[in-house]
């Protein structure tokens, strides 16, 4: 027998931190987060299989997340700064998919580009267990928080909790949402803080009314430049934004070699991070009076991806002057609902939503996302947060040198080149 639920909160955060429960990464602190008497860990009670060792390709995961990223980019305002993590949003929706069935599950998987669910889950599981270097890494952690007074589906452990732990390395906690809500909030915030190295110390002030479950995903990226900038070569200069000219701190490198491309309309550069195949790719208009928004936005998803990929086979040339702004950008995407529904995720919002692997009578009410990036002389840190609220329903080489002066709007991605997967994507129109 399943008890009808009033709300289900699923929250995914990508945030700056060094600890995670699913990755073997420098700075990681695997294991259970310390909790008090209001919370009981059920993690060890759930048996999962070992990670598959024969996975050498992440093609489905890469293709799905990258296509999802391009769809997101096209749906966001063209006149503003944007920054988001398709990896975060797709991971959150994949967690949601674990509990979905029927048409709801089909729509989620179509939007994510899942063609073989077992393969997708195996690739996700293997990616979460990927080894990273000391200086450049991605951490991922997941947890499930369940109200102890709620009656769940009789098969929730087999159908939902075990796959969540198996594929997403999720810790599972039972908590007293009703009797000790303040302590539960404190424990949840402590978990997030611990698993983000205190970069996100709080996500809850109170448990939203009627909430019976919280799924929390934390992902953190940190990368130190392979060729770092130095503070003595950082000085103020103009950035010519779409709406105004501003004076910002500009970092400089001189006479260094980078991978560089120019197709006559758009030029790009690859800035590698130390130790792993993670890079930042930056794209600008070739012409001084060019508009990156116009040039990039007119491309199809396939053409955008080809542009990004073209840097992988481009020439390594000497860049006489590389000028990159030192910046912090934090963006919110409130109400992804319309975007996601336009991507085909519709029944999840309706009375006919099918999340029966968790409980009957629940549906998504809203999806929100915010992300933050810090770029300085040492490297990059990136953070993001996604929350899904679910409520009750009634149901070539050259001797020439080049300059790359980033003093006007640009598009950039942070990409794991070992898989080709876009972890973060953004555009800066103004600073």
Predicted regions located by residue number:
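Extended hydrophobic
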Residues: 215, 267-283, 397-431
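Short alpha-helical patches at coil-to-helix transitions and adjacent helical residues
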Residues: 86-90, 209-213, 419
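Detector for small/aliphatic-rich hydrophobic stretches
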Residues: 4-177, 428
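Extracytoplasmic/secreted cell-surface and envelope-processing proteins
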Residues: 102-108, 289-292, 331-333, 383, ...
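Non-catalytic interaction/Regulatory regions outside core domains
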Residues: 8, 12, 33-46, 361, ...
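Non-catalytic, conformational "gating/processing" segments within enzyme and secreted inhibitor domains
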Residues: 33-38, 79-80, 117, 121-286, ...
